[in-house]
């Protein structure tokens, strides 16, 4: 396993640990999710380039599109929550209410 793959896996695991530790603020959780998505994008790009798997060349681009959609929805949710509640604490949300 190359050094680049180990660094990408370490970045993914650090983002996962950050998501598990700093989940009180929505902005911190969104940043950790973006770090995980970026690590997955780099890993899938490196894998398709190293294996010369031409049928999967679109997979990193599709992952990048879904990551952009996730970021847009997350930021819209963050703006809505901060306008409604005044903070971005996840504990202030009651997900059982409509």
Curated annotation (Swiss-Prot):
GO CC annotation terms, alphabetical: mitochondrial inner membrane; respiratory chain complex I
Keyword Heme tagged: no
Reaction it catalyzes: a ubiquinone + NADH + 5 H(+)(in) = a ubiquinol + NAD(+) + 4 H(+)(out)
Family annotation (InterPro entries): NADH_UbQ_OxRdtase_chain4L/K (IPR001133), NUOK/Mnh_C1-like (IPR039428)
Cellular localization per UniProt: Mitochondrion inner membrane
Gene3D superfamilies per UniProt: 1.10.287.3510
EC number in record: 7.1.1.2
One Pfam short name: Oxidored_q2
UniProt-listed GO biological process terms: ATP synthesis coupled electron transport
Keywords attached to this entry: Electron transport, Membrane, Mitochondrion, Mitochondrion inner membrane, NAD, Respiratory chain, Translocase, Transmembrane, Transmembrane helix, Transport, Ubiquinone
Chief location of this protein within or outside the cell: mitochondrion
Membrane topology: Multi-pass membrane protein
Transmembrane segments: 1-21, 26-46, 61-81
Molecular functions (GO terms): NADH dehydrogenase (ubiquinone) activity
Subunit structure: Core subunit of respiratory chain NADH dehydrogenase (Complex I) which is composed of 45 different subunits.
Described purpose of this protein according to its UniProt entry: Core subunit of the mitochondrial membrane respiratory chain NADH dehydrogenase (Complex I) which catalyzes electron transfer from NADH through the respiratory chain, using ubiquinone as an electron acceptor. Part of the enzyme membrane arm which is embedded in the lipid bilayer and involved in proton translocation.
Family: Belongs to the complex I subunit 4L family.
Name used for this protein in its record: NADH-ubiquinone oxidoreductase chain 4L
Gene name in the database record: MT-ND4L
């Amino acid at each position: 396993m190359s050094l680049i793959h180990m660094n990408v896996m370490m970045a993914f695991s650090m983002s996962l640990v950050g998501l598990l530790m700093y989940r009180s603020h929505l902005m911190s959780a969104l940043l950790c999710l973006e770090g995980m998505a970026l690590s997955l994008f780099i890993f899938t790009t490196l894998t398709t380039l190293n294996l010369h798997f031409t049928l999967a060349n679109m997979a990193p681009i599709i992952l990048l599109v879904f990551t952009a959609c996730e970021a847009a929805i997350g930021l819209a949710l963050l703006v809505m929550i901060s306008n409604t509640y005044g903070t971005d604490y996840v504990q202030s949300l009651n997900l059982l209410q409509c």
